[in-house]
């Protein structure tokens, strides 16, 4: 099946095309990338709270990349699974389950169940159908959380979320030190698993489904089943990100389910580059840092500059920031030959 998937990708781009196939080896740039948050932890201690938000949002963006960038499923309601994970972890803590790591697992399971059920509706239609179904599911869950205020807190949010020290030792502090380290460890661990998935024969087959059009069904690949599986994995990862935000902030707002969060997530993925796995992490970092910096300079019109940045990157860097860097590297390599 991996060979058939590779053939499907090559067929899409031409028999002689140079198509990058998944490679599970860790590269030096990847190692350097993960050293950045470690350096930032010591170099910018006053920004550890912001750093944990970047890491969590980055994982959230990676979860969308699995769905959109790899499986090719257009989604405007991915925040639904983020919110489900956040409310699951938050409600567990409110009702006496304060242990954080087990809360992450429960949130992932609940979000994956919701994602699996939704996947049957999503994979059946085309792009427009998928867009409307995911948007509708997100709006429905937001309204459920709003109406069930006696459980979720409604528009006031879910407060009283108390999280026990991690491993019984590391308590969450106001400076965000524990939150940063906890987020980094969890995000990296989940990323390693997701990276292994997309570089596996299964991940290659999903990419073949996205690239191969009608060829994959013709060779007997279970297209719907594999798309549902990838969608479910993406939902589980989003649920973990939601649980992290609930545990590190000890609060769950109804905006975790909101359309605006899904829209911002899509912007981050476009900025970083869809279908590259690291694109979600890069896009989240650029978006949040730019938002923090620009809102401090111009609290009223900062969104204009975010939009301007997005337009520039889309027009001049095909494939987002990482796509633009790849193009520059390829051009430089040709120039040195």
Model-found features: residue ranges?
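Transmembrane alpha-helices and adjacent helix-loop boundaries
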Residues: 2-337
């Amino acid at each position: 099946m991996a060979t058939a998937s590779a053939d499907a990708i090559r067929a899409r781009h031409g028999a002689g095309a140079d198509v990058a196939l998944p490679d599970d080896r860790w590269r030096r740039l990847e190692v350097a990338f993960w050293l950045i948050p470690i350096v930032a932890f010591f170099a910018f201690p006053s920004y550890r709270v912001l750093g944990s938000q970047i890491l969590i949002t980055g994982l959230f963006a990676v979860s969308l990349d699995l769905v959109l960038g790899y499986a090719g499923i257009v989604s405007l309601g991915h925040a639904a699974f983020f919110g489900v994970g956040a409310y699951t972890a938050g409600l567990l803590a409110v009702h006496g389950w304060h242990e954080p790591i087990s809360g992450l697992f429960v949130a992932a399971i609940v979000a994956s169940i919701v994602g699996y059920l939704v996947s049957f509706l999503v994979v059946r239609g085309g792009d427009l159908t998928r867009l409307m179904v995911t948007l509708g599911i997100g709006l429905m869950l937001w309204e459920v959380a709003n109406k069930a205020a006696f459980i979720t807190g409604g528009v006031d949010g879910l407060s009283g979320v108390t999280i026990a020290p991690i491993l019984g030792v590391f308590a969450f502090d106001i400076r965000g030190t524990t939150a940063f380290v906890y987020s980094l460890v969890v995000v990296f661990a989940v990323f390693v698993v997701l990276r292994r998935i997309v570089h596996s024969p299964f991940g290659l087959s999903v990419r073949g489904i996205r690239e191969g059009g009608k060829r994959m069904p013709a060779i007997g690949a279970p297209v719907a089943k594999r798309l549902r599986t990838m969608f479910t994995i993406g939902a589980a990862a989003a649920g973990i990100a939601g649980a992290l935000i609930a545990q590190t902030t000890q609060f769950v707002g109804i905006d975790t389910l909101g359309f605006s969060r899904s829209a911002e997530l899509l912007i981050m993925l476009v900025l970083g580059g869809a279908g590259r796995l690291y694109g979600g992490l890069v896009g989240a970092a650029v978006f949040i840092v730019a938002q923090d910096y620009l809102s401090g300079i111009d609290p009223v019109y900062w969104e204009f500059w975010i939009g301007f940045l997005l337009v520039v990157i889309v027009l001049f860097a095909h494939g987002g920031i990482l796509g633009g860097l790849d193009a520059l590297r390829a051009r430089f390599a040709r120039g040195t030959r």
